């Protein structure tokens, strides 16, 4: 891989995650939890995958950072055609970005469907979405 291609990719992900550009001189270990999550995703995207696996990306993050991160994931899916497999305990947040949902309880699939179907099911809303 040519260095200028790598530099172009880095610049691209700095545009997607401007917080990382602002902190480019910091060591990764000194970044906040949200910034570290953004860095992990940007590093994964450098290899141009067709599928991005995200395990609890909102865990321990401030609400504003979580919102920002999920907006980026949604945009990557819509604009880049990137498939994203998301495991997330914040069901309401996941439903805002998901196309297809598999609801798990103690390791078993208890419901599946489109995000709209899951969101509109009264029994699921009461049991899992706090409605």
Q: Residues of each region from the PLM?
A:
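ABC-type ATPase nucleotide-binding domains, specifically the catalytic core motifs of the NBD
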Residues: 1-8, 16-21, 113, 131
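Short, glycine/charged-rich "phosphate-handling" switch motifs in NTP-dependent
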Residues: 100, 112
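Conserved ABC ATPase signature
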Residues: 27-31, 35
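Catalytic Walker B motif of ABC-type/P-loop ATPase nucleotide-binding domains
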Residues: 52-56
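Helical segment within the ABC ATPase nucleotide-binding domain
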Residues: 67-81
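ABC ATPase signature
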Residues: 31, 44-45
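A short, proline-enriched helix->beta-strand linker immediately N-terminal to the Walker B motif
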Residues: 46-50
């Amino acid at each position: 891989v040519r260095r200028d291609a790598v530099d172009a990719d880095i610049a691209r992900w700095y545009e997607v995650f401007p917080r990382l550009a602002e902190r480019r001189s910091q060591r990764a270990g000194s970044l906040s939890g949200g910034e570290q999550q953004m860095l992990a995703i940007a590093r994964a995207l450098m290899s141009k995958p067709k599928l991005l696996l995200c395990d609890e990306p909102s865990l321990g993050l401030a609400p504003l950072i979580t919102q920002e991160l999920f907006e980026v994931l949604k945009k990557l899916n819509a604009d880049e055609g990137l498939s994203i497999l998301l495991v997330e305990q914040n069901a309401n947040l996941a439903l805002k970005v998901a196309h297809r949902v598999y609801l798990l309880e103690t390791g078993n699939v208890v419901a599946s469907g489109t995000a709209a179907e899951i969101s509109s099911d009264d029994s699921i809303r009461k049991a899992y979405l706090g409605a």
